[in-house]
Curated annotation (Swiss-Prot):
Annotated organism of origin: Treponema pallidum (strain Nichols)
Family: Belongs to the FHIPEP (flagella/HR/invasion proteins export pore) family.
Record protein name field: Flagellar biosynthesis protein FlhA
Annotated GO CC locations: plasma membrane
Predominant subcellular localization, coarse grouping: membrane
Subcellular location, record wording: Cell membrane
Polar residues biased stretches: 341-350
Pfam families cross-referenced by the UniProt entry: FHIPEP (PF00771)
Chain ranges passing through the membrane: 8-28, 34-54, 62-82, 114-134, 202-222, 239-259, 290-310
Membrane topology designation: Multi-pass membrane protein
GO biological process, one term: protein secretion
Sorted UniProt keywords: Bacterial flagellum biogenesis, Bacterial flagellum protein export, Cell membrane, Membrane, Protein transport, Transmembrane, Transmembrane helix, Transport
InterPro entries reported for this sequence: FHIPEP_1, FHIPEP_3, FHIPEP_4, FlhA, T3SS_FHIPEP
Biased segments, Basic and acidic residues type: 329-340
Length: 707
């Protein structure tokens, strides 16, 4: 606590006292010694602000700048008032060193010549500030504020779209929205604060004119001085005061201009200048040649121009050497890669008897390599890391590391996902373009190349960046190429989670659980071999049921499994699903805990329950003829499709006897319908029946007669 109080009194209290001093300096008379100190502080303080602006990486990193601009402006005006009071009060007895120094040493002359020089310098400073720096900075601040505020809604919608697509996490979405708010606050404040700078320039002219006129009145009328002497004294001091006031103001104007003209480039101003001025050696050679041509012309300063030409040529030579080194390094890298490939090809005889396959891999055409190029941001790599974390949280499955391979046999703009070396999905991208997906109500078509979203098969359009905002406004969901692959990867992991979960993964789950729940693990491993545990977990994942609640799953297996290994896997899966019933219900229920369900007609349900059989790999199936399958599936579609169009995503609710077999029937026909049993529905869930699946009685009777 002591440390916190100390920090408070050395920062917040100091700032508060400083602001009060600034305000009171306007009305409280100051001794000349204090005035000198404050003027020197004002000069160095504005210089520090300028240096801070030059070294920040982006404008919002210096978010206190608008407040500092106001404080510095008021402080400078307070010093103007105090110095005017002292000059008019003391006249030629004024002993302020800072103003005297600027009125004599900085001006570079004395007498009438010094006045003319000082007045000229003062006018030039005023003109530069008023018509060049301040006017430009004010205009840029206005435009930046307007565009920032106009695009806030669009940026927020884009962030929401990426979050809903699973591309970014909730924390990343919040941070991006906070950054948008910071930018809006900063540029909105700068729009108003820039008016302080322009107003400061105008008031400087006014104060100078008033000081000269008031000085002549005081000197000639009240002090009985001669007109020439009064003009010399007060004009000299006024110009010194004006120059001393305008120099900090000029520094502040330059800082304002710099901070509102900074682009989105990363790095400080100096780093950006160095990087962008060192891209081409040819520029410096051309500049050197131009200087040599000027040097040989009559009347030009030959030695200075030749010296500058040599300097430019030297810089060009250094850049050319660096370019050659980069080219050599690049060639060496390519040679090393080729040599490595040759060594790989030549060393096949030394390879072991087994070449393991990657559990999950992403192969890219060479045109998509920039997406994983670390020198260009490698945005896709960071997204993949987030996806693996989300898979662990959503499904309870720790996805394996994803190997990324450049496949020269792929189309340059294509990519594909493989699990254990077998392709499971592929897509095609256009780098530099955005995919506008018709995910909802679209009010207007946008120009572009018509295509299909590779993840969900929705109609989409490839659009240019200039049409991105328009597409978002009319209802499209717009995603970047890296986000497309990331979303596709998320879907691949979800739909193929059962194939990704190997026995080694299951053993890792068991080992991790043993550390905190050794009794549960010992009980289940005594009754269930590793292979059966794997099949149960795969059965859950195959139907998108999270296995994160591993303790509940293992306890259920321990309760219902048998050491004689006689309990079939489908039975164990049903028992585990019943234990996880509330979790499954929440997965499909709406916000009011209402589960929208389809039911089977009782006669159809009875008929199907008599058709259950187990395959050799322990899958529960329905032994129906092709005609019977067709009629059952058509009856389900008749209820499911209209209900889906009304906005519901219903599940099929049936008995636990045929639940698994019905899901396998849908899966074999690529119908994505969740199937639950009555025993899985928790007591606090409300069930709303949206339709009954039935077949005409004559058809059911025909089925029975065939038996």
């Amino acid at each position: 606590m002591a440390h916190g109080k100390s920090a408070f009194f050395t920062t917040d209290a100091f700032v508060a006292i400083s602001v009060l001093v600034v305000v009171f300096s306007i009305v409280v008379p100051l001794p000349t010694q204090i005035l000198d100190a404050l003027m020197a502080f004002n000069l160095i303080f504005n210089l520090l602000i300028l240096l801070m602006v030059l070294f920040v990486e982006k404008p919002t990193d210096f978010s206190v700048f608008p407040s500092l601009l106001l404080t510095s402006t008021v402080f400078g005006l307070g010093l103007n008032v105090s110095s005017t009071r002292l000059i008019l009060t003391l006249g030629d007895r004024f002993s302020g060193y800072m103003i005297r120094a600027f009125s004599s040493f900085v001006v570079g002359g004395s007498g009438t010549q010094g006045l003319v020089i000082g007045f000229t310098v003062f006018i030039i400073l005023i003109a530069v500030q008023a018509f060049v720096i301040t006017k430009g900075a004010t205009r840029i601040a206005e435009v930046a504020a307007r565009f920032t505020l106009d695009f806030n809604a669009t940026k927020s919608m884009s962030i929401d779209a990426e979050y809903n697509a699973g591309v970014i996490t909730e924390e990343e979405a919040r941070e991006r929205k906070r950054q948008i708010q910071r930018e809006a606050d900063f540029f909105g404040a700068m729009d108003g604060a820039s008016k302080f700078v322009s107003g400061n320039v105008k008031i400087g002219i006014f104060i100078t004119i008033v000081n000269v006129i008031a000085g002549l009145i005081v000197g000639v009328i009240f002090r009985r001085e001669g007109f020439q002497a009064a003009l010399q004294t007060y004009t000299n001091l006024t110009i010194g005061d004006g120059l001393l006031a305008q120099l900090p103001s000029l520094l502040l104007s330059v800082a304002t201009g710099f901070i509102v003209t900074r682009s989105s480039d990363q790095g400080s101003f100096g780093q950006n200048v160095q990087e962008q001025f060192s891209k081409s050696a040819l520029v410096y050679f051309i500049g050197s040649g131009a200087l040599i041509v000027m040097a040989v012309l009559p009347g030009f300063p030959h030695s200075i121009l030749f010296f500058m030409a040599v300097c430019f040529a030297f810089v060009g030579l250094q850049l050319r050497k660096r370019e050659r080194v980069h080219v050599q390094e690049h060639e060496m890298q390519k040679s090393s890669d080729k040599k490595g490939m040759q060594q790989t090809q030549d060393s096949t005889s030394e390879m072991g008897p087994i070449v393991p396959l990657d559990p999950l891999s992403l192969e890219l055409g060479y045109g998509l390599i920039p997406l994983v190029d670390k020198e260009k941001g490698a945005e896709l790599l960071s997204r993949i890391t987030v996806i693996r974390k989300d898979a662990a949280l959503d499904l309870g499955l720790v996805a394996p590391k994803i190997r990324i391979i450049d496949n020269m046999r792929l189309d340059p703009s294509s990519y594909c996902f493989k699990i254990q070396g077998l392709e499971v999905a592929r897509g095609k991208l256009r780098l530099g373009w955005f995919l506008a997906i018709k995910s909802g109500q679209v009010t207007e078509e946008v120009p572009g190349e018509r295509t299909i979203d590779p993840t969900f098969g929705l109609p989409a359009v490839w659009i240019s960046e200039e049409n991105r905002d328009r597409a978002e406004r009319v209802g499209y969901t717009v995603v970047a190429p890296s986000a497309i692959i990331a979303t596709h990867l998320t879907q691949v992991i979800r739909t193929n989670a059962a194939d990704i979960l190997g026995r080694q993964n299951v053993q890792m789950i068991i080992d991790a659980l043993r550390k905190e729940y050794p009794a549960v693990v010992d009980d289940v491993t005594q009754k269930c071999p590793l292979g059966k545990i794997q099949k149960v977990l795969q059965g859950l994942l195959r139907e998108q049921v999270s296995i994160r609640n591993t303790v509940a799953i293992f306890e259920t297996l321990a309760d219902f499994a048998s050491t004689s290994d006689t309990v079939p896997v489908p039975i164990l899966i049903e028992k585990v699903r019943q234990r996880l019933g509330r979790q499954i219900c929440l997965q499909y229920a709406d916000e009011q805990n209402v589960l929208h369900v389809m039911r089977l007609d009782s006669s159809l349900e009875t008929f199907l329950s008599e058709k259950i059989a187990l395959t050799v790999d322990s899958l529960s199936i329905l032994t129906l003829s092709l005609d019977e399958q067709r009629q059952v599936l058509q009856a389900v579609r008749t209820v499911f499709v209209p209900t889906r169009q009304e906005g519901y995503i219903p599940v099929l609710l049936t008995t636990d006897t045929i639940r698994s077999a019905m899901w396998n029937l849908f899966f074999s026909d690529r119908i994505e319908i969740a199937v639950m049993s009555y025993k899985e529905v928790s007591t606090d869930m409300r069930i709303e029946t949206v339709g009954v699946v039935r077949i005409e009685e004559s058809d059911v009777d025909a089925f029975v007669r065939k038996q």
